[in-house]
Design a protein with these regions (language model features):
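Sec-dependent N-terminal signal peptides
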Residues: 4-17
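Extracellular pro-sequences of secreted precursors
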Residues: 19-290
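A short, glycine/acidic-enriched catalytic loop
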Residues: 296-298
Length: 298
């Protein structure tokens, strides 16, 4: 019995350690990032529809293309911290792939709304299936930059699966090494910092950055971190007295908390939004709590 338990535990541990996708940051500095993508495995399911059998490709925890009537293939999206005024350019340093023949990749049904039963939507092949070319055509895509509180970021999308619907060949890139250089010219969402925007990185946001940005390195992690971010409680005026003990308790815990009557914050959704934005610009705001029913807080 002991041996059986040990074997079961070993199998469970191995399954937890194994990942279909492994990503390693080989080098990271102010000028560039070198990142290695490894696709260890993937899942193939057979889907039957109107006398045709399709291959459904699944890469655990990774999204798939949802362009209607185009091959529904997985891709890998990861974010990187970039400079405030430049963007990412990509160079493929190395790659290798395997080819799978006699494939028939299932077409995507598109981005289905929640009020529609996906089983009622048919599988339809679009014009892509008539072209003697691989889809997607590019091994990678670079999305527009965005700002997330303390940093400007950019998503690099790797397309390790490419399918030619005429030859029925699917390429799977098992290993790709990309060099991401911060000399791109995409000026979307440039980050103009002000003295008031130079916030300390709060603990909760630091955890978020670690999960989101592959190049959130020790240099960023050791930036001075405040104990906790601030909270504002926007409360329906008649309930403010009842919330005073809650606010006192939060302050005693070390979370600087400000109680704001709704009449002070504003009597419309836009006014309250402007109040929160102004508070955010001048404080280390992390938490917002609304107190009141939907008719009391617009």
């Amino acid at each position: 019995m002991v041996n059986i338990k040990i074997k079961i535990l070993f199998i469970l541990c191995c399954s937890l350690l194994f990942s279909e996708v492994k990503i390693n940051v080989i080098e990271s500095n102010d000028d560039h990032v070198i990142v290695e993508y490894i696709v260890n495995d993937f899942t193939t399911n057979l889907v039957s529809y109107e006398n045709e059998v399709y291959n459904e490709i699944i890469l655990n925890d990774e999204p798939r293309f949802i362009e209607q009537n185009k091959p529904q293939l997985p891709h890998i999206n990861r974010s990187f911290i970039i400079p405030d005024f430049s963007s990412i350019s990509v160079e493929v340093l190395s790659s290798n792939y395997s080819e799978y023949k006699n494939m028939n990749i299932v077409p995507s049904k598109g981005n289905i709304k929640r009020n529609i039963d996906i089983n009622d939507v048919p599988y339809l092949k679009g014009d892509t299936y008539n072209k003697n070319a691989f889809f997607p055509a590019s091994l990678y895509e670079v999305k527009d930059p965005y700002i997330l509180r303390d940093f400007r970021g950019q998503v690099v999308q790797l397309n390790p699966f490419q399918f030619n619907p005429v030859t029925n060949v699917m390429k799977v890139y098992n290993k790709v090494v990309l060099k991401l250089t911060f000399d791109g010219t995409n000026s979307q969402n440039q980050f103009y910092r002000t003295l008031t925007s130079q916030k300390k990185i709060t603990k909760d946001y630091s955890y978020m950055y670690m999960e989101r940005f592959l190049n959130y390195t020790n240099d960023y992690r050791y930036t001075p971190v405040s104990e906790e971010g601030e909270m504002i409680v926007i409360c329906y005026d008649d309930f403010c007295d009842e919330m005073s003990d809650f606010v006192d308790w939060k302050n005693q815990k070390g979370i600087k908390t400000t109680l704001v009557p709704k009449s002070t914050a504003g009597n419309s959704a836009n006014a309250i939004k402007d109040y929160i934005e102004n508070f955010y610009d001048n404080n280390d705001l992390v938490y917002v709590l609304f107190v009141g029913d939907k008719d009391q807080i617009p």
